[in-house]
Amino acid sequence: MNDSEFHLLADGLMQALEEALDACQSDADIDCETNGGVMTLSFENGSKIVINRQEPLHQIWLATRAGGYHFDYRNGQWRCSRSGVPLPQVLNEACSAQAGIPVTLDL
């Protein structure tokens, strides 16, 4: 993957995340702020999830209260570089844990 392809994929992911948060039917109050390619999700309890792009590595990084994850684009999906779990699954689990109620983002 070259830098241009990475930018297209990363931009598409960030846009999809914003749309999924807007459409989320959960009772969780999740605020989303994007600044300089970094998306911060803030929860009522003060916890945060940070999603950012690592251009030199062509990765998406996700920082949660439980830990950090690095995602590579493989076979049409962003997948955790360690476990192979798709980003939407990791993000839904992290949002649910931090919100204290089930959260499902339709990505």
UniProtKB/Swiss-Prot annotation:
GO terms for biological process: iron-sulfur cluster assembly. PROSITE patterns: FRATAXIN_1, FRATAXIN_2. One of its GO terms (molecular function) is ferric iron binding. One of its GO terms (cellular component) is cytosol. The keyword Transmembrane helix does not apply. InterPro entries: CyaY, Frataxin/CyaY, Frataxin/CyaY_sf, Frataxin_CS. SMART domains: Frataxin_Cyay. Pfam families: Frataxin_Cyay. Keywords: Iron, Metal-binding. Involved in iron-sulfur (Fe-S) cluster assembly. May act as a regulator of Fe-S biogenesis. HAMAP family: CyaY. Belongs to the frataxin family. This is Iron-sulfur cluster assembly protein CyaY.
